[in-house]
Amino acid sequence: NGYGEAEAALCVTAMSIGGIVFQYPLGWIADRIDRRTLLILCAASGVLGAAVTPFVVHAPAAMYAVLVLWGGIIMGVYTVGLTLLGERFKGPRLASANAAYVMMYSMGMIVGPTIEGAGLDAWDPHGLLVALGAISAAYAAFLALRKLQVSLSA
């Protein structure tokens, strides 16, 4: 039930390759559209990736293509978020904000796998994807709400 270690490592590698390859295109897009909107789209890609992946698991080429695309876009959450941080803070405040950003990102790397593992335990083999999709949906919804609040207060 599920993939072995070698296959799982290939999946992680595919997502990581996407994260590397998509840095420049996402940066280019971030220079041309509203960065908050791009951040919401990157977060929402987590929902789409989680929804599409079960349909391509039996077609390795399609699955790795989806994982490269998904990894590239979802990893843009960090990059675009960091760009927004740089827009908002300057000087010593930027250093403090960056430290807080890294700390919160690290907390997500601790809490996320716990939630994902619980999802996998609860609904094997789809629980991991359900958890990833739910986390991404919650983050995208939070970002959209925050963007709406900022636009209403302007």
What are the roles of these predicted feature ranges?
Residues 91-121:
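A late C-terminal transmembrane helix in Major Facilitator Superfamily
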Residues 37-52, 133:
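Structural signature of the two symmetry-related core transmembrane helices
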Residues 118-136:
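A membrane-interface helix-boundary motif in multi-pass transporters
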Residues 130-154:
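Multi-pass alpha-helical transporter architecture, strongest
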Residues 16-24, 109-110:
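Residue-level signature of mid-helix packing/kink "hotspots" within the transmembrane helices
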Residues 22-34, 120-121:
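Helix-to-loop junctions at the C-terminal end of transmembrane segments
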Residues 75-89:
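Intracellular juxtamembrane helix-capping segments at the cytosolic ends
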Residues 10-19, 101, 105:
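Transmembrane alpha-helical segments of major facilitator superfamily
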